[in-house]
Amino acid sequence: MTPNEQLFKELIHRHRDLIWSVCSSYRFSAAWETEDLFHEVLCTLWCDFGSFDGRSSERTWVWRVANNTIVSLKRRYANQPAPASPPAAEPASQPDDSPALLQLVDSLGEPDSQIVRASMYGFGYAEIARMTGLTVAAVSMRLTRARRKIKRIYEKQ
């Protein structure tokens, strides 16, 4: 095993729960299972492994690659129907991911759904701003508006 392969293996070992959690939090087309998304993210992480420059934390970088990979796949396969039921196995350390809440988050569109998901995973405004390329003020405003919108929709149900 090469040194890069060993470093990559260690990176995945440290962050596999986060990657799995991000993958399982997306309700995708019926053709895509959480495991398929997980493997797509691993492939993207491997391809981008040399691009990590340390400007953000390793955890932030992994989350951003995972989220962006899934968002790209979601755009590419937008015409396929959503799955009938949520994935079965999910780690206990992930945020509240009830299907109803995730459906509300998905309804926000990008980048608001990405911002809310990052907040659900405990990332701060500055980290989310770096992930999305927005200012901290814009992240704060979008997150506040998104939370209000989710609350209004949830209360109507």
Show the residue positions of the predicted features.
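Pre-recognition alpha-helix immediately N-terminal to the DNA-recognition helix
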Residues: 18, 100-103, 110-114
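Acidic, proline/glycine-rich intrinsically disordered inter-domain spacer in sigma factors
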Residues: 6, 76, 80-106
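Arg/Lys-rich amphipathic alpha helix in sigma70-family domain 2
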Residues: 51-53, 64-85, 94, 145
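Structural recognition of an alpha-helix C-terminal capping motif at a helix-to-coil junction
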Residues: 36-43, 47, 56-68
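DNA-recognition helix of helix-turn-helix
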Residues: 132-157
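Hydrophobic positions on the alpha-helical face of helix-turn-helix-like DNA-binding modules
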Residues: 41, 65, 115-116, 128-129, ...
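Short, charged helix-capping/linker segments at alpha-helix termini
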Residues: 1-10, 20-40, 51-53, 131, ...
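Short amphipathic alpha helix immediately N-terminal
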Residues: 107-130, 156
